[in-house]
Amino acid sequence: HNVITLDPMLFEDDDKSQYLYFTTWGIFDGFGCGVAKLKDGEFDVNALPAGIKRDARRWHEDRPFPIAADSFFCEKRLIPNTELKDVFEAPFVFKRNGIYYLTYSSGSCHTDTYRVQYATSTEGPMGPFTYRGEILTTNENETVHGPGHHSILNIGDNYYIVYHRHNNPKSVHGFNRQVCVDRLSFD
């Protein structure tokens, strides 16, 4: 698919199959997030894929490794906006108790509309997904303002969300941010 892609996130399932998630800034009609299943053995976390140069400054000029190459993936899916709501960036996927959680940032990263939302799937890492709601938002007294662009950590039996939010008092256009960690709870 010829789309803008950003904020890639690699997820490895229990069977060692790997999935690459990305967002599109929500500028395409009908979808804002995509997922591609990598062919077995295509991505080794201990080695750079063939063609990627260690000099990252030149990588974008030479483009030796076209991430969208059909030969790299065995399955691709654009996740429709009927499954996710207001996708902007920063997809993050994790699995807990057989449920796949697809989390992502929504709104403008410069305002109080920036937030983290999520959807779940019991069928697999490619969905279909069911939208579930918001995880992090600007609170009423704005001590938490514009939270987003997160990751989820699993440490023992606990889950934590690591994200940034605008400095308080609020920074102009959200350019100054704080890194935060909060414990996640599940209903």
Question: Which role does the model predict for each range below?
Answer:
Residues 1-187:
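Carbohydrate-active catalytic/glycan-binding domains of CAZyme proteins
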